[in-house]
A protein has these predicted regions:
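Boundary/junction segments of secreted and surface-exposed precursor proteins
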Residues: 1-10, 40-67
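Extracellular and analogous surface-interaction loops
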Residues: 70, 75-78, 83-94, 122-130, ...
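A mature extracytoplasmic/lumenal domain signature
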Residues: 5, 36, 98-102, 136-140, ...
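Extracellular beta-rich ligand/substrate-recognition surface
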Residues: 68-80, 107-117
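Surface-exposed coil/turn segments at beta-strand junctions on protein surfaces, enriched
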Residues: 11, 25, 89, 115, ...
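Short solvent-exposed strand-capping/beta-turn motif centered on an Asx-Ser/Thr pair
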Residues: 23-28, 89-91, 101
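Secretome/extracellular-domain signature
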Residues: 114-196
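Feature for long, exposed domains in two main contexts
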Residues: 1-42
Length: 196
């Protein structure tokens, strides 16, 4: 995946199908966004972000109100405990594309990079008025050993998950963090300490 591919637009049927891309566009450039594009008759697009937050504390209502001022999301996102709530504007079949956030960088034994988040995609039938809870994963804190990147998810109002993408691992003191995976078996990151 190249940085340019994060901005690709896929068009779907004008009548019933819509496309939603929920991603951390910064998997390559560290600019953490969650983009939701609705390609229906009106061609609306919505870009959700982490409202300029990173680390373990999620955004507040004030953070997101400021972030979305002057956009199509202004006044349409409610934040509760760092999770954004949004109401589906039109019924249809949606493709949702989700990216987890990158892990934090590490600097203990050198300069190491956090692993990139996983990418997941799925198709869903959504109804107008349905409430979705959206969490945009936040980049892990960079330190001597970086923190893990946050996962991104979209769930229904009853907490039924629609789609989840795990975050990347934080960089250790002696190596880069591992990327998020899409398999159920997970991934182990381990290194060997070698004194300098």
């Amino acid at each position: 995946v190249t940085p340019d591919s994060f901005d690709e637009i896929l068009f779907v049927d004008e009548v019933l199908n819509r496309e939603i891309i929920i991603q951390n566009a910064g998997a390559a450039d560290l600019n953490w966004n969650l983009n939701l594009f609705n390609y229906g008759r009106d061609g609306s697009s919505y870009t959700f972000t982490n409202c300029d937050k990173e680390g373990k504390e999620g955004p507040s209502q004030e953070d997101c109100d400021s972030e979305y001022q002057g956009t199509m999301l202004e006044g349409f996102v409610t934040v509760n405990g760092g999770i954004q709530q949004w109401i589906v504007p039109a019924s249809g079949h949606y493709t949702i594309d989700v990216y987890g956030a990158q892990g934090g960088d590490g600097s203990y034994g050198g300069s190491y990079t956090g692993g990139l988040g996983a990418n997941m995609q799925g198709q869903f039938a959504l109804e107008a008025g349905q409430i979705l809870h959206i969490l945009v994963g936040q980049k892990g804190i960079s330190s001597t050993e970086g923190g893990g990147g946050g996962g991104s998810f979209v769930v229904k109002e009853d907490d039924t998950p629609l789609i989840v993408a795990g975050g990347g691992g934080g960089a250790g003191g002696y190596g880069d963090g591992v990327g998020g995976v899409t398999e159920t078996s997970g991934q182990v990151s381990e290194g060997v300490f070698t004194p300098m």
